[in-house]
Amino acid sequence: KLDKYDEYAYSQSKDVITSLELERIMNAAGPTKGHLERLSDGKAPKEMVFIQCVGSRCADDRGKSYCSKICCMYTAKHAMLIRDKYPDVNVTVFYIDVRTPGKNFDEFYRRAVEQYGVR
């Protein structure tokens, strides 16, 4: 299904990964034993970019017209884990808008920005 969104270069670069693939990489039982590294060359990244809302809130037939309501929170979690373990890695998040629909979720997301320096 990701071929619908090839403008993000998922099929063209080993370093463009999904959130599920990142979860696997960050896992101690994963292919890199929990070490964050680029799949293309095994080196540590200097920058990580998360692109939100891909396939959600689409005006065309490639995706869904609604928000999944989970992406903002697990991106905040991933961003904080990366910044905590790798403080020299710059983390940037691109999004339509931030949606934090649960109790204290907005504080959690704000902490990623204010305490962890996620942009």
PLM region spans:
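A conserved beta-strand/loop element that lines the FAD pocket in flavoprotein oxidoreductases
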Residues: 90-93, 113-119
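Rossmann-like dinucleotide/flavin-binding elements
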Residues: 2-102
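Short, aromatic/basic amphipathic alpha-helical patches
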Residues: 6, 104-116
